[in-house]
Amino acid sequence: MRERLRHCKRVIIKVGTSTLTHPGGHLHLGRMEALVRQIADLHFEGRQVILVTSGAVGAGLGRLGLAERPAEVAAKQALAAVGQGLLMQRYEGLFSEYGLVVGQVLLTREDLEDPDRRASSAQVMERLLAWGVIPIVNENDTVTSEEIRVGDNDTLSARVAALVRADLLILLSDVDGLYPADPHLHPGLSPIPWVSPDDDLDRFAGGPGSANGTGGMVTKVAAARICAEHGIPMVLACGERPDVLRQILAGEEIGTLFSREG
């Protein structure tokens, strides 16, 4: 199955808050630059790439000099309003260095569940890809309450992958993959190279996400299962690894491959 990843044309890449920001919440420009360079390389290879990005709330946190992510919904929505603009400004500047244009796509749960809005969202992204634009997707946190959220960007990226009939979803996080036990408690463990989303993975998926994010291994396993329902493989890998996207799409055994075929 790894060898088949070399031929994936339409790829969804999700990058998490822990990869995009420093612990204090400020954007990690070095990692953003490395990510954009890799995506540009994939684009010029002839692949279609959609980026699902976290980091809006974290960027707002850093810009306003706040020490902790607030629990209040309105405060998080306000932080997203500040941070989303900062995030897109950075992406626009970085991609423009490669002559690439980006398009912001902010989605809500209704955009993915209502048939008419779902069809409209798919048409917009198809048009952007046809024009050679890099769609940059995030949940519209500013107008979305906790009760009607998609939930997290792992789930969002899987739903986007299904929406546009992607060939592959890559989740970039602060972990190297799915481990058989907590690697913090068991140093020296290697990630599991391949698992089926149909397996009992919940025992491997304990633990919350990072302090500035909303995800964790539970949401990544859930994303893999959404992808599996649509025949889409998913790879979970560390976003801090140099050239991680090139290595995955070269068929190298990087991270954990979630697929019904080994």
Curated annotation (Swiss-Prot):
| Molecular function terms, GO-annotated | ATP binding; glutamate 5-kinase activity
Specify the enzyme's EC class, one word: transferase
> InterPro entries in the record, alphabetically?
AceGlu_kinase-like_sf, Asp/Glu/Uridylate_kinase, G5K_ProB, Glu/AcGlu_kinase, Glu_5kinase, Glu_5kinase/COase_Synthase, Glutamate_5-kinase_CS
Q: Which UniProt keywords apply?
A: Amino-acid biosynthesis, ATP-binding, Cytoplasm, Kinase, Nucleotide-binding, Proline biosynthesis, Transferase
Which residues make up the binding site for ATP?
K14, S173, D174, T214, G215, G216, M217, V218, T219, K220
Matching entries from CDD domains are given as: AAK_G5K_ProB (cd04242)
Please give the SUPFAM superfamilies that the UniProt record associates with this protein. Carbamate kinase-like
Instruction: Determine the domain of life of the protein's source.
Output: Bacteria
Enumerate the catalysed reactions. L-glutamate + ATP = L-glutamyl 5-phosphate + ADP
Which NCBIfam families has this protein been placed in?
proB
The name this protein carries in UniProt is: Glutamate 5-kinase
Instruction: Specify the species.
Output: Symbiobacterium thermophilum (strain DSM 24528 / JCM 14929 / IAM 14863 / T)
